[in-house]
Amino acid sequence: MSSRRRAYPQPQYAATPAVPAADPQLQQFQPQQAQGQAQQAQGYGAGSPAYGVDQVNQQFQNMNVGGGVAGQPMANQYSGQYQPPPSQANPQAPYQAPGADSFGSQFAQHPQYAQPGMVGGAAALPLNQLYTTDLSRELPPSITDLSLPPPPIVLPANSVVVPTSEDSNAPPEYFRSTLNVLPANNSLLKKSKLPLALVVRPYNTLHIDSENIPVTSDTIISRCRRCRGYINPFVTLTEQGRRWRCNFCNLQNDIPSAFDYDELTGTAKNKFERVELNHSVVEFVAPKEYMARTPQPIVYTFIIDVSIDAVNSGLTSTITRTILESLDRIPNDNKTARVAFIGVDSNLHYFKFNEGLDGTDLLIVSDIDEPFLPSPDGLLINLNENRSTIEKLLIDFPTYFEGTANDRFALGPALRAGHKMISNIGGKLICFTATLPNIGEGKLTLRDEASHSGKPKESQMLLSNADKFYKSFAVECNSAQVTVDLFLTSAKYQDVASLANLPRFTAGQTHFYPAWSCAKAEDVTKLSREVSEHLSMDIALEAVLRVRGSTGIRMSSFYGNFFNRSSDLCSFPTFPRDQSYCIEMSIEETIHKSVVYFQAAVLHSTCFGERRIRVMNLAIPTSTKLDDIFASADQLAVANYFTHRSVEKAFSSSLPDARDYLVKSIVDILNVYKKELVAGNVSGSSPLQLSTNLRMLPLLLFSLTKHLALRQERVPSDHRAAALNLLSSLPIPHLIKYIYPTVYSLHNMGDECGLPEQIVQVDEETGEEETVNSTEILLPEPLNDTKASWENYGLYLIDNSTELFLWVSGDVVPGLVYDLFGTDNLYSVPTGKTELPEFSFEESEFNYKVRQIIGKIREQKDSVTWKNLYVVIGGSSNEPIEISQQRDLMALRMWALSCLVEDKTASEPGYREFLTSLKSKITQ
């Protein structure tokens, strides 16, 4: 290919004038006050002054707002929508008492000590101001809001022990609430129709070394004697700093002497430098009192399908090769990791390792009704000590089952055997299957999909657990500290709905690969990469999660993959690093304090044998005003909560009930807002008004009703069950993209897109500015999920969190096709699951940039998912007849276009029609 940089015809790449840009549209906002307060109403007519970004920013600058989510300075946290407040109300602002030289000498004058247990000055503190958006005038919706942080948390300036601490309140990536101002009583919460819940994500990366969480290793842990809360940045020091008052229950506790004096070195210490008093997210190295037993080694038992379907599809050989190549990635710093291997068809094939010898013995157990371990030792072995023998087994493993004709798969007995093998230690049972379990305990059969798919009883007949074994066995595993992970690969029915119970109650995950085949290089790449990443994850072991809140607040419901051992204790045999959890709360008594507190603690053993406690702290102000509640609602966290509730209804009731629940929730919220917060509740005013910080919520919940998991169209039950499972476990950034896919326009992207982002650095000595390239690839701005934002000659990339679609419009410019694919003939371009040809920057700048963008999107430090790329050629009046008759291409087009959730389909409305239908449901 010749070296060139093609200049594409500008008229063809100009933005369509009729399509508004997807920028924040704030011109319809007006500052809103509670109903009954004097306010000058502004109309929406042509004569009304536009209320733009500058005006909104000015309003935020004029507000005496403090606090916010910690982790970085306020100016960096809330760029775009929320501006930094004046420093006098900022709890993160540096504080120095008059005449004080250190924290140790200033505590006597600190307001916290003057009024123990009270939050001074909070009554006069203004909270986030309410702005109203007319949803019907906000079309297309401003999707840039989906990347904004939640509304800032406004706290009194003296609410923390160490005023100079910049991250005393938990970052939303770890710990966030649906409401960043809590109702002071339950009646106000019910009146708002907004959910009160916490979203907890203790780990944000797959590997410990990519985190920057402070660790206190002296094993000195100070906890409240009454409620057992951990000392944190929001406690109050009393009695000249010798005691601390719990911010949860108000009990006074002694401060450990080790906070002020190091017995080992004989030197004085400054308690105000303690990690737990300065940081919202900390990790304690736990003493022996926190251990029921010595931390156990990490254990992986691989249960591998060796039936005819698995062997013929290449699953058996691919998995053993992947495990072999991933042995160095298994967390094993302390050289204690153990592994075992079981092959499964109608028999159980154990592999015994002989100590001191190179070979292994294959031991076959045909009694699957009462499976037993054929040897007391040699089945579960140390990875480091037996490395060469393990490698040889993995190389030879597929040869043991070549030419098999056995079509049986005894998954239940294999799970029982694996459980017996590791139940005294705990660990993981990782199952790789290509066959429906069809023999022995847990045997499953085909369901009548044709009769029930898309019908009212679909949930009951196709999505329910078909055998109680999968729930009861999962509970047994949880008690024995055993997690089950599933990797399901088959072109046939596998009953994902039943099998997914195993990971759901053992803190595992179900990975689904429909129609997987080793004949497709892309299939092999995806499975291998995801398995390898999964094995490399620095999981925590023998973990429990407890979330506590201030007096008057109760944790009522828990959502996610774990087992709820008691009313407030969630059990995790192993704690994954790529999932999040939702906890619903109830207000049981009136809250009289101006700030409430939440604390999530994960007691766990690290994969390198250390017992630790990860503690996350969150402080949120309270209010008795409904407008404060709405102005500080976190729309992404609210959407996360409604997602969990809709999944629960899909399983327990029906899919129509789940969709109706989502629509009713939006209607209820709009009704409350119109009745209580629209100024004067003027008759004839638009019923579709909502606070600006919630304006994406109707779009997200509408998109959820059209999602593969909930849509009313016929969907294969395995696909639907797998989608429901993802909805209930994905962290918020991935969940939002899974509900509302991200679309990028590639044909008219800026010259800087696809290249490293340029950063201006200032030399501290000379003051000179220097432009350097960062490691971050710049992505194009996203478009709305609608064909109306597309051009019929464009090139678009769709990211739905699990796959990537490269849409090549049927009337695309031939030069662009050549630069991207190396051919002028559009219809010679390979479609479906594929990869782009690789050209250097000199050969084709456009190809290089697009591949860089795809590579950047695939980079995920917090997920094991590898996104396959599907190339889709769009329709055209000029396409050959044989192309338009290709069923696979037609299906691929429909799949990709289903990501454009704002558009109308044959059976479902578009977002504009949805908003119109809401008007009739809103009380006039």
Swiss-Prot record:
**Secretion signal, residue range per the UniProt entry:** none
Q: Membrane-spanning regions, if any?
A: none
The family database entries (Pfam families) matched by this protein are listed as:
Sec23_BS (PF08033), Sec23_helical (PF04815), Sec23_trunk (PF04811), zf-Sec23_Sec24 (PF04810)
Q: Where is this region: Disordered?
A: 1-50, 67-107
GO biological process, alphabetically ordered? COPII-coated vesicle cargo loading; intracellular protein transport
Q: Where is this region: Zinc finger-like?
A: 224-249
Q: Which GO terms describe its cellular component?
A: cis-Golgi network; COPII vesicle coat; endoplasmic reticulum exit site; endoplasmic reticulum membrane; equatorial cell cortex; Golgi membrane
- Summarize where Zn(2+) binds, as residue positions: C224, C227, C246, C249
Where does the UniProt annotation locate this protein? Cytoplasm; Cytoplasmic vesicle, COPII-coated vesicle membrane; Endoplasmic reticulum membrane; Golgi apparatus membrane
What does the UniProt keyword field contain?
A: Cytoplasm, Cytoplasmic vesicle, Endoplasmic reticulum, ER-Golgi transport, Golgi apparatus, Membrane, Metal-binding, Protein transport, Transport, Zinc
User: Which is an annotated GO molecular function term of this record?
Assistant: SNARE binding
Q: List the disulfide bonds.
A: none
Membrane-topology descriptor: Peripheral membrane protein
Q: Which InterPro entries match?
A: ADF-H/Gelsolin-like_dom_sf, Gelsolin-like_dom_sf, Sec23/24_helical_dom, Sec23/24_helical_dom_sf, Sec23/24_trunk_dom, Sec23_24_beta_S, SEC23_SEC24_subfamily, vWFA_dom_sf
Q: What does this protein do?
A: Component of the coat protein complex II (COPII) which promotes the formation of transport vesicles from the endoplasmic reticulum (ER). The coat has two main functions, the physical deformation of the endoplasmic reticulum membrane into vesicles and the selection of cargo molecules.
Q: Which family does it belong to?
A: Belongs to the SEC23/SEC24 family. SEC24 subfamily.
Assembly, per entry: The COPII coat is composed of at least 5 proteins: the SEC23/24 complex, the SEC13/31 complex, and the protein SAR1. Golgi apparatus membrane; Peripheral membrane protein; Cytoplasmic side.
Q: State the name under which the record lists this protein.
A: Protein transport protein SEC24
Q: Which organism is it from?
A: Debaryomyces hansenii (strain ATCC 36239 / CBS 767 / BCRC 21394 / JCM 1990 / NBRC 0083 / IGC 2968)
The root-end lineage is: Eukaryota, Fungi, Dikarya, Ascomycota, Saccharomycotina
